[in-house]
């Protein structure tokens, strides 16, 4: 009898480890937080940005479509790890000097809070065993955004509007990435 209970516990333990991404936070909170972050970002819009500056930034710092393509083909844990890194990089970027940005500071703080909670929630889903080293290309991409757009344009309101648009694209892409896991479960 004791052996049978041990085998049942072992089986349940192994099965649970195999489906470690069955995470309550991801299943119940991710979509809400994702929607909140996108809504907050939309309230931060500044319509005074010149479209010629948009074209200039696109040539300087191209959106990393290839990285998202690779991530979409990765394991579930690697998808979440990639998403957590993107959210962490967004938080670092928005922590820079934003005194010239057109949005209210409270909105920006709320946005940072939601993005940080998203990253922490997803981090709890992948557990400590899956914290691989960061994707250097993702890190370098965000560093280029900081240098070429923010610093290059003097942290102006226009530079922050370009960053806001770029980050919205990232948030939509990571939402798609994580949503693919939600529909798969």
Question: How would you label these PLM feature ranges?
Answer:
Residues 19, 38, 42, 49, ...:
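Eukaryotic basic, amphipathic alpha-helical target segments in cytosolic regions
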Residues 34, 76-79, 131, 138, ...:
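Intrinsic-disorder-associated interaction segments
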Residues 67-130, 135, 142:
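Extended, amphipathic alpha-helical segments that serve as helical scaffolds
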Residues 135-185:
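Eukaryote-biased recognition of C-terminal alpha-helical segments
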Residues 23-88:
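Mature extracytoplasmic or organellar-lumen-exposed domains after removal of signal/transit peptides
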Residues 2, 11-29:
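N-terminal signal peptide
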Residues 1-3, 179:
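Eukaryotic intrinsically disordered, low-complexity regions
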């Amino acid at each position: 009898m004791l052996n049978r209970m041990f085998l049942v516990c072992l089986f349940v333990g192994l099965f649970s480890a195999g489906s470690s991404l069955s995470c309550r936070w991801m299943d119940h909170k991710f979509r809400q937080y994702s929607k909140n972050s996108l809504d907050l970002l939309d309230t931060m819009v500044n319509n005074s940005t010149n479209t010629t500056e948009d074209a200039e930034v696109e040539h300087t710092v191209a959106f990393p479509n290839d990285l998202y393509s690779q991530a979409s083909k990765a394991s579930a844990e690697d998808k979440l790890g990639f998403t957590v890194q993107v959210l962490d990089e967004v938080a670092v970027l928005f922590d820079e000097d934003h005194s010239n940005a057109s949005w209210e500071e409270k909105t920006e703080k709320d946005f940072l809070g939601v993005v940080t909670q998203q990253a922490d929630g997803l981090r709890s889903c992948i557990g400590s065993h899956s914290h691989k080293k960061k994707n250097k290309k993702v890190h370098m991409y965000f560093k280029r955004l900081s240098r070429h757009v923010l610093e290059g344009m003097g942290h102006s309101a226009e530079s922050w509007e370009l960053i806001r648009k770029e980050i919205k694209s990232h948030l939509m892409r990571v939402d798609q990435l994580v949503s693919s896991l939600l529909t798969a479960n």
